């Protein structure tokens, strides 16, 4: 088997499980479970792994019948047995066209069927997937086809005073979006300037806290501008004051989003 | 009548332009460039650690989920409190129906400030020429899976 073939095998297997996780109704879930089992059975390397781990035959007719309706499957402690147990369970389900209701009911969460399917696959089938993917990785190493590095590590050379930023937002209700606000070349000075203005413009109930925060930010900006050492005690005082201001400013405000940027930049200042 | 309400949760990227994601299967955290995830052809993301593909929404981080729950609860409570006020106005002066208002409801959780830590190391996947940030744990593994094509 070539390096490429092995990578495709591993990917197809993981994709088959990924599809199972996305099933939204019971017919689709059963169809995708059949495909998943077929992916295992038609692939000699994976099938060999299953056979090596075969410890004993489980009577799932009896196990499901005797199982209390609210009980989850009692998975074996031993890893080999766990592989064999889950594989035989999935075989039994697919060969007998069982409805997910018949065996996955204890895995439900709320009224949605999709959650029952997903939870069963996450809590049970995922264990088998984990064993198989680990085996495939080990097998690749033993076969000597591991080593061609796909991921190359990039050294992060951003530094305070000259960090390039490409800021965006993640919107997390039903979509993921990004808005690019390119502030290339923006440094600690400009963040500090923006932050001081925001602090001055924002109405904060605790006047002393606001005053302290402005003073600390100004002092840090001045020291950075003059190339002087910014003492850790000053960073700590500034961080505490700004964190407290964040709590009063309210989430989502410009002030609440600029403060973490400043804190992060300040904490990254190299110590002498 | 069902009225749809869109609640936006925003979180800025870190200084390198990456946002945090967390696999709901293996709980491993990693970072991607939001613009890459939003490309039309990206329908699923492969976790760099376990390699299982899932819908991008399955990778929301705990802090974002917390704020989604907090904002949703706040909105529901606002509606209920407003309903109580409206009910009081409707039956004001009515001899047959008396409305006794209780204390306004308060949410059980509040939104937290969202910000990215500058952590993890940048890796570039040669297969798709896309970048990601991964933890030391993922780095130490046999090789992270590309979040976009699933190859390692």
Tell where the protein language model's regions lie, with residue ranges.
Chain B
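Short linker/helix segments within small regulatory modules
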Residues: 35-44, 135-145
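General detector of N-terminal leader/presequence modules that precede the first folded domain
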Residues: 23-36, 40-56
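Residues immediately within or flanking Cys/His clusters that coordinate Zn2+
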Residues: 18-20, 44-47, 119-125, 143
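A broadly conserved sequence feature marking short terminus-proximal activation segments
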Residues: 1-23, 69-122
